[in-house]
Amino acid sequence: NTTATNTLSGGSRAQRGTTRAAHIVGVTVKDTTSYFGWGKASGADFTIDPGLWVIDSFGQTVIALIYNGRAFEWDASLTAATSTRATAITGTEVPTASRHMLVSTPDRHIVFLGTETTLQTVASQDPMFIRWSTQESLTEYTPTAINTAGTQRLTDGSRIMSAIRGRDAMYIWTDTALYLMRYVGLPFTFAFEQVGTNCGLIGKNAAIEVDGAAYWMSENGFFRYTGKLESMQCLVEDYVYDDINTRPRDLIFCGLNNLFGEIMWFFPTSSSEAINRMVSYNYLDSTTQ
């Protein structure tokens, strides 16, 4: 009311998360003592994963996946491409929740990792499940007798961390192991081989491939794969692992300076939630710095 009469009219109220106490609009409210408190604040901790994107090319079409979300496409061949927004890839068979995405070349299959076991059902997302499209398709993911779409579930680990393309296979890391995914054609399309255990990836951007060899940072050391798994000698390993913060693990990333033959890992120390330290490895003379 605009005049102080100690009465309220035409009001309703409710508090989210508490027992509802509402007053119908149009009825005079004289006594509002029927209320409930907000309750005690929760002291539980929780972690929100960073909103990371994966971007790959499918010819002149750019495919982008938001971490644990859906994929988008952007056509670079359009006349007004720079003023055209990316759009979600639509269709009744397109996955809507995935941890990672990669385009297999030269066979041109789109591979979703840590994705849904039941298409377009977010609740069915399995962090160890892999699904790929039929050849040359953005929208067909249901395996049939006449296409090359398919699925595979990895077994060693609790979640797929990341994947990168290599010279003759794709490298797929879980939190505990390394797998190779190779295109073999019909009838299986892809073959999977586990080539390492106790060598999982520490963060989704902590691996790189250089001259046919994969290098990565794990929870328990630095590794290389050149056809066989190798634990890399590192004189500063204790310096790194005694003071690393693994809570924001997906912020840890790997970079390459091929001018000087260096692979670099950037990571946060135990006193920081952001990147503030770097360790480098010279793959030309096999030294760490």
Language-model segment annotations:
Residues 35-59, 93-107, 153-166, 203-210, ...:
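Structural signature of eukaryotic scaffold interfaces centered on beta-propeller domains
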Residues 1-51, 78-83, 93:
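Small/polar beta-strand repeat architecture
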Residues 72-88, 121-151, 180-191, 223-237, ...:
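Surface-exposed loop/turn elements that mediate protein-protein interactions on large endomembrane-trafficking
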Residues 32-39, 95-179, 266-283:
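N-terminal beta-propeller domains
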Residues 155-289:
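Beta-sheet-dominated scaffold domains
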Residues 36-43, 84-92, 147-154, 191-196:
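A short beta-strand motif characteristic of beta-propeller blades
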